[in-house]
Amino acid sequence: MAEFVFQMIKARKSYGDRVILDDVTLSFLPGAKIGVVGPNGMGKSTLLKIMAGLETVSNGEATLTPGFTVGILQQEPPLDDTKTVGENIKMAFGPIAEKVARFNEIGEEMANPDADFDALMEEMGKLQTEIDAADGWDLDSQLEQAMDALQCPDPDTPVNVCSGGERRRVALCKLLLEAPDLLLLDEPTNHLDAESILWLEQFLHQYKGAVIAVTHDRYFMDNVAEWICEVDRGHLYPYKGNYSTYLETKAKRLEIQGAKDAKLAKRLKNELDWVRSSPKARQAKNKARLERYDQMENEARNNKKLDFSEIQIPAGPRLGSTVLEANHIHKAFGDRVLIDDLSFTLPRNGIVGVIGPNGVGKSTLFKTIVGLEPLTSGELKIGDTVKISYVDQNREGLDPNKNLWEAVSGGLDFIEVAGVEVPTRAYVASFGFKGADQQKLTGVLSGGERNRQNLALTLKQGGNLLLLDEPTNDLDVETLESLENALLEFPGCAVVISHDRWFLDRVATHILAWEGDDDNPAKWYWFEGNFQAYQENKVARLGEDAARPHRLHKKLVRG
């Protein structure tokens, strides 16, 4: 009978009077694939740190079975800043690389006529067996493939000059090549584009060890997880199946719990209705939004009462017939062309998902729309009635010494958002900042907290055309669902850069996709429909191979 990799028995974790995990019992076997969900601050990352041995439980037991190895991808992973990207990743091979080096040394020693051939042959045979078992003969090839698939920086790049996203990709690459028996991933899809995420899903499907992933990426959980573990108010609730199955089972649990979770049940019902609907029905619903602008705008005008227990987007000024038109636009920096001969028309009530790898010009497109970057040629026409809401992702104007509430509210108890007076404490709380979190200094916020603050700053501008740059990064599933529902009810337009496929399927009426290649690296494609419909269209236009990740030339088989 197989041994459990890890066990927790009646485990409790607290910090002073604050209980994070309470009376938790769990165990799992090698090969388990588990997705961990729950609101931010409920202890998901703490659970992973306990499994990794970085934290200890206050009471009870938490034990990694002797003989098994464990590795963790943290939200801010530690790397050796004195080494290059390649040197950091090569540390993953450790003992295997040493065995390969020793194997080669033996070959040289056997050229000596005085060598002890029997002893050397015995050592060589043992080393060969161990290297074969670890698939250790092509380490350089594995390294190159994994770095390419995850878009790691050049191997000679010093780690100390890498951005936060680059460091995470380097750390993830190193961890996957280490191939621990228990692989712990905290938001593994952050800072990955759609092609890298697809590669990671395929890699984890073949992974022999146990995988525990904290992630907000619901398609990732649908495609990888065989169990969902929900962390809620100190307790763990296991659900057999993937994320869609979890939604079904949790809905039944909430029915039993009754009205105390009425708002959560309503939000869950909205998502569950979407999951149960056919792809054609989803597409029809998204398309129908384009014809309902007048109705949605009138309803928003007549309903001035807002409930900021969830994210709300008040209606901006009424849109005219023209919102945004791109006519043969071209954008280049010197010889580097990012956008070439792109034309599209954004209709009223349209929500556009902008997709493509990092560095192909998505954020540059936003800067051309708001006038921060000039076009090289072509024309961008913005309607006279359009008011744009946009905050630059660099956020250079924010005072790091102001607390979060002050930065968003300007120190006012009430602010006006699109003609509606809003209590600022409640407004900030709707983005997941409760109580003492509102007093955190802007300069020390985590990446996820800065992202939510950026979203609050953008939406308070009261525009009717929202430009949102990666709003889904580091949001928990509940906040994501709240944002999705707010966008679906918003009478206006949005252009959203995101790699979250579930999010784009639910809200997008159009997709603007980078489809560049060696011949035309600045090619973009405008499509009416959501993400899934776009993917089907892409296969129909370009063939089945278009849906596969192209960075992976040969599968990794180690681990």
Predicted region positions:
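ABC ATP-binding cassette signature C-motif
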Residues: 1-262, 308, 312-559
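Intracellular alpha-helical coupling/juxtamembrane segments of multi-pass membrane proteins
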Residues: 249-282, 286-292, 296-303
